[in-house]
């Protein structure tokens, strides 16, 4: 795809950055933190703090013997719920009486592991001339140790066995498979792979069970690409997969977000090998549809499953319901719930959580809360996923007080936060520019005995990226790799988005190329990420090419695809194309989902199209969707720019009634509105208000207040705000300086204006064309063209690094604009 975009790619090189730290100016306290208020009135303090909830949790975990650090992951093992022996007592089937006696002694707490070698020598001495009996005894013995969770002893027993003379003649694949499985459960997947490769190099013939065990071990530890590589090697070696192998690799494909056509091709190959899908296969295929929001494909598999003679179970219904939820179709998800109940299946916590997530994802938080209450009334207690989903939903909608209230309810219910909860708080603080608080939450993860997961790192990358902090993005990425995480598709997508938000589009495309080189296949989320990057640059023609590529069959577009196209048209000033796409949404050619209507409000506001913005806002509400904080901010912004104070206040009242917490964008829009009015002093009042709430103003906030005072010739007040801005750690930009220069020039204070130019150059800020235009135009407005020309002639003395031809441009401006 990068080739089709015809975009210049940088050579792979990571931008230089200091070793990543939370804050170079002060040390971050490791005292657990979740008490800072985000709004007014402040939410109740969150005491006890997160680590107190984890007081009895053991943070110690076994580390794998591998070059790659593993992460503990809570994953359902393939086939675990269908194990016919689940819950049954251990049977000594296949184990000799002496073996049973040895096993009983080994599982005793006081067994001296130093005696293991001699005990094993005595046990296997009678079998030394009977290879088949040795193998059977070893298999039963290892299974017994595994049943009693004595994995370490089992692995040591196997190591002892491998040191025996002619061990290969006594070893069979059943033993290899069970050892690989044990190593996988112990997090020692690399050791399992090394053993597997060593046996192959020694000439041992590995069968399908050994291959499948290694594939499962990689899959269960989240090392999906390595699982696929083992599957490919298995086929290359002429080893035929079984149904279980296919089911495991289909599950891996789903986790990787493999394109649907590749998944269906594998199923067809399975059938051509004479292997018929079972119920687990169909359930896995439905689950595979989640990543691409493939609700139609999931419904088709659902019908095929029935036609094949299989009965639906709770897993089937939950999987289909989840696909509808992730496809932004909560109504269809609710229909699945009703059908599930009619067929005699009681909704589980998984069912309710999927539905709550579906409603929260679409901003339908009242419905999500109603479901939570409904599940509690029916005896299903909300768990950490329920609360964290609601917390994230309220945060995303801009309702921070409601989010904190949910966290309080979670604590009071005795529900321990998990890593997802921490990730939600990291995102909440990061989205509001509270980076110190965000990093305290990050520190608290380890204090509470947890470890950051891939989502934690991706969230940090996204937060720093959307704030244009490219050196921090590079620093986090380095720390992430140092922690042992291998970038997967979501990380690459996040990096593409982060660098494009920082204005480093070439670097974003370099990341995309690296992703392809790493063997990661683009999916819907990747295409949408690239489209979003193109949209930021207004590159609408290339966006249309990407859309055409998707529609050609590689990947079915969704509502986020069209959202990016709207942004591309808006940023590229293609208002006609934007209107045409909007009409397709309103007419139903493209389904008018909530996120599309919200995007229409945003792009129309950005393009200052008031009637169109109001239409999109009305359509959103009339179709039963709830506006979020971004949508409401867009309406405040467009009303503020047009000095429609009553309308802007009406939106603010709506926000207050519905429990929305004003964001920095809200405050900046209000400051902008007042900065252009007779009541310009109100801009600083709002600045003081947000400071009092513990929110750090950004450069836009300070520039707006400076403009308010400069516009009204209150230069001392403007200078006071400038000093305050610098003291807060925010570096003035060219807009800041140009505001002063323009104001001084308009008041004939040219000496002061030129003094500001010297000051900005001295402090590392380069003047732009607007800087010098203001001074030249100021002279010309007063009919002082000669002085304007003298200023231009002396420009090189003032700014030795001014662009070549800048003086000629300014002289031409004097002639053409001021004849």
Curated annotation (Swiss-Prot):
Annotated PPR repeat ranges: 172-206, 207-241, 242-277, 278-312, 313-347, 348-382, 383-417, 418-452, 453-487, 488-522, 523-557, 558-592, 593-627, 628-662, 663-697, 698-732, 733-767, 768-802
A Pfam family the protein falls into: PPR_1
Keyword terms of this UniProt record: Repeat
Matching InterPro entries: Pentatricopeptide_rpt (IPR002885), TPR-like_helical_dom_sf (IPR011990)
Residue ranges of the region described as Disordered: 57-93
Entry superkingdom: Eukaryota
Family listed: Belongs to the PPR family. P subfamily.
Protein name: Pentatricopeptide repeat-containing protein At5g02860
């Amino acid at each position: 795809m990068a080739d089709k975009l015809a975009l210049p790619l940088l050579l792979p090189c990571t931008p230089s950055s200091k070793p990543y730290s939370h804050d170079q100016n002060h040390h971050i306290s490791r005292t657990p933190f979740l008490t800072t208020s985000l709004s007014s009135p402040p939410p109740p303090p969150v005491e006890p703090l997160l680590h107190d909830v984890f007081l009895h949790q053991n943070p110690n975990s076994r580390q794998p013997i591998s070059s790659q650090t593993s992460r503990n992951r809570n994953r359902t093992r393939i086939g675990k719920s269908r194990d016919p022996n689940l819950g049954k007592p251990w049977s000594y089937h296949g184990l000799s009486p002496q073996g049973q006696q040895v096993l009983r002694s080994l599982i005793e707490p006081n067994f001296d592991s130093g005696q293991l070698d001699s005990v094993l020598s005595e046990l296997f001495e009678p079998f030394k001339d009977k290879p088949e009996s040795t193998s059977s005894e070893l298999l039963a013995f290892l299974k017994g140790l595994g049943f009693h969770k004595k994995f370490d002893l089992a692995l040591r027993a196997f190591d002892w066995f491998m040191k025996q003379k002619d061990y290969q003649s006594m070893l069979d694949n059943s033993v290899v498979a069970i050892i690989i499985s044990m190593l996988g459960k112990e997090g020692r997947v690399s050791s399992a792979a090394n053993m597997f490769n060593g046996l192959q190099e020694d000439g041992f013939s590995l069968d399908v069970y050994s291959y499948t065990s290694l594939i499962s071990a990689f899959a269960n530890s989240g090392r999906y690409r390595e699982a696929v590589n083992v599957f490919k090697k298995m086929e290359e070696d002429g080893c035929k997969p079984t149904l279980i192998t296919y089911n495991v690799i289909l599950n891996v494909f789903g986790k990787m977000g493999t394109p649907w056509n590749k998944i269906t091709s594998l199923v067809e190959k399975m059938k051509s090998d004479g292997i018929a899908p079972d119920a687990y296969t169909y359930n896995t295929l439905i689950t595979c549809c989640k990543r691409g929001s493939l609700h139609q494909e999931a419904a088709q598999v659902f019908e095929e499953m029935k036609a094949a003679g299989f009965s639906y179970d709770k897993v089937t219904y939950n999987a289909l319901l989840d696909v509808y939820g992730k496809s932004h179709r909560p109504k269809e998800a609710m229909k699945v719930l009703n059908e599930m109940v009619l067929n005699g299946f009681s909704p589980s916590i998984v069912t309710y959580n999927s539905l709550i997530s579906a409603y929260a994802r679409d901003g339908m938080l009242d419905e999500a809360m109603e479901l939570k209450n409904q599940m509690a009334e029916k005896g299903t207690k909300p768990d950490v996923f329920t609360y964290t989903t609601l917390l994230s939903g309220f945060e995303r909608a801009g309702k921070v007080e409601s989010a904190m209230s949910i966290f309080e309810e979670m604590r009071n219910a005795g529900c321990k936060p998990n890593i997802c909860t921490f990730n939600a708080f990291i995102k909440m603080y990061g989205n509001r520019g509270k980076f110190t608080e965000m990093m305290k939450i990050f520190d608290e993860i380890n204090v509470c005995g947890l470890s950051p997961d891939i989502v934690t790192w991706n969230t940090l990358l996204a937060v720093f990226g959307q704030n244009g902090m490219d050196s921090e993005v590079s620093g986090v990425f380095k720390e992430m790799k140092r922690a042992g995480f291998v970038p997967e598709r979501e990380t690459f997508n996040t990096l593409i988005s982060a660098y494009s938000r920082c204005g480093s589009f070439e670097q974003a495309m370099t990341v995309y190329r690296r992703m392809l080189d790493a063997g990661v296949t683009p999916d819907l989320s990747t295409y949408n990420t690239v489209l979003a990057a193109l949209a930021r640059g207004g590159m609408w023609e290339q966006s249309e090419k990407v859309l055409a590529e998707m529609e050609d069959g590689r990947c079915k577009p969704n509502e986020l695809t069209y959202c990016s196209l709207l942004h591309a048209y808006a940023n590229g000033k293609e208002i006609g194309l934007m209107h045409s796409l909007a009409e397709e949404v309103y007419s139903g050619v493209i389904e008018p989902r909530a996120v599309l209507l919200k995007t229409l409000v945003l792009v129309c506001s950005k393009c200052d199209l008031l009637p169109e913005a109001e239409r999109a806002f009305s359509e959103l509400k009339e179709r039963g969707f709830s506006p979020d904080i971004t949508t409401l901010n867009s309406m405040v912004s467009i009303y503020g720019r047009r000095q429609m104070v009553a309308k802007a206040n009406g939106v603010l009242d709506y926000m207050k009634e519905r429990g929305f917490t004003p964001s920095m964008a809200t405050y900046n829009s209000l400051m902008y509105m007042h900065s252009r009015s007779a009541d310009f002093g109100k801009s600083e009042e709002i600045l003081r208000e947000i400071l009092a709430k513990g929110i750090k103003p950004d450069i836009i906030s300070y520039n707006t207040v400076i403009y308010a005072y400069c516009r009204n010739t209150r230069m001392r007040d403007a200078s006071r705000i400038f000093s305050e801005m610098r003291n807060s750690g925010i570096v003035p930009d060219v807009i800041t300086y140009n505001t002063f220069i323009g104001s001084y020039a308009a008041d004939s204070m040219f000496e002061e204006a030129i003094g500001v130019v010297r000051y900005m150059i001295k402090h590392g800020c380069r003047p732009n064309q607007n800087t010098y235009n203001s001074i030249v135009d100021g002279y010309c407005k007063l009919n002082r063209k000669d002085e304007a020309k003298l200023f231009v002639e002396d420009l090189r003395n003032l700014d030795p690094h001014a662009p070549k031809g800048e003086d000629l441009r300014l002289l031409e401006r004097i002639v053409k604009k001021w004849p």
